[in-house]
C-alpha cells in the first residue's frame, strides 16, 4: 500500500490537489482547510491513501492526500467504522484532532455530535473507535462499544415509535448525556424534547 509520494504540487483547489511525480500527475481529494501550496520548483512528501470501490461492475480508484501522517492514520480509522464513508471521514479531519481524541476517550457523545461533518449516527460510530492514549505511554483506549450499542438501541426504539430519523438525531444531539446513563430515562427526555419542538412548530403555523 502506498503511504506517500514525493512530487511537485502543480494545482491546489479547495477540495483537490494535483501532485506530479515521475512524470505522472495524480488527483487527490483533500480536506477543506488543508495547508497545501502550489510549488512547481520544490517537490515535497505528500501522505496519501488510495481507496478502491466497485461501481457498475468496474473498480474505481480514488486518492486522498493529507497534511500529516497523523491525519492519514485518523482517516484510515474513520473509514473502518460502519456508517462513515470517505467523504465524511475527510470532513471530520477539519476538526481539532486532539479535542476529538479527548471526546472519544471520555465518551462525550454530545460534543462528538457538534463536530464538523458529524451527526448522531457518526457520533455513535466514533464511540467505537479504538485509540491509543499518547498521555499514558501509548496505552490502548478500549472502544466504548457498549455505549455505542445503547445509542443504537435508543435510536431504534424511537424510530419504532414513529419518530423521524432526522428528528431523533437532532434531539439526541441537543441532550447532554452523561456516562452510565439510563437508556429509558434518555428516551423519555428525547420524546419530551421532540414533543416540545413539535408544539412550537404547530403554534407558529396556527
From Swiss-Prot:
Q: Which UniProt keywords apply?
A: Cytoplasm, DNA damage, DNA recombination, DNA repair, DNA-binding
Cell compartment(s), UniProt: Cytoplasm
Biological process (GO) annotations held by this record are: DNA recombination; DNA repair
Q: Name one GO molecular function term.
A: ATP binding
Q: Quick one: a GO cellular component term?
A: cytoplasm
Alphabetized InterPro entries for the sequence: DNA_helicase_Holl-junc_RuvA_I, RuvA, RuvA_2-like, RuvA_C
Which residues lie within the region annotated Domain II?
68-141
Record's SUPFAM superfamilies? Answer: RuvA domain 2-like
User: Which CDD domains does this one have?
Assistant: UBA_RuvA_C
Q: Which NCBIfam families match?
A: ruvA (TIGR00084)
Family assignment from sequence similarity: Belongs to the RuvA family.
What is the role of this chain? Answer: The RuvA-RuvB-RuvC complex processes Holliday junction (HJ) DNA during genetic recombination and DNA repair, while the RuvA-RuvB complex plays an important role in the rescue of blocked DNA replication forks via replication fork reversal (RFR). RuvA specifically binds to HJ cruciform DNA, conferring on it an open structure. The RuvB hexamer acts as an ATP-dependent pump, pulling dsDNA into and through the RuvAB complex. HJ branch migration allows RuvC to scan DNA until it finds its consensus sequence, where it cleaves and resolves the cruciform DNA.
Q: How does it assemble?
A: Homotetramer. Forms an RuvA(8)-RuvB(12)-Holliday junction (HJ) complex. HJ DNA is sandwiched between 2 RuvA tetramers; dsDNA enters through RuvA and exits via RuvB. An RuvB hexamer assembles on each DNA strand where it exits the tetramer. Each RuvB hexamer is contacted by two RuvA subunits (via domain III) on 2 adjacent RuvB subunits; this complex drives branch migration. In the full resolvosome a probable DNA-RuvA(4)-RuvB(12)-RuvC(2) complex forms which resolves the HJ.
Tell what the record comments on domains: Has three domains with a flexible linker between the domains II and III and assumes an 'L' shape. Domain III is highly mobile and contacts RuvB.
Q: What is this protein called?
A: Holliday junction branch migration complex subunit RuvA
Please report the organism this UniProt entry assigns to the protein: Mycoplasma pneumoniae (strain ATCC 29342 / M129 / Subtype 1) (Mycoplasmoides pneumoniae)
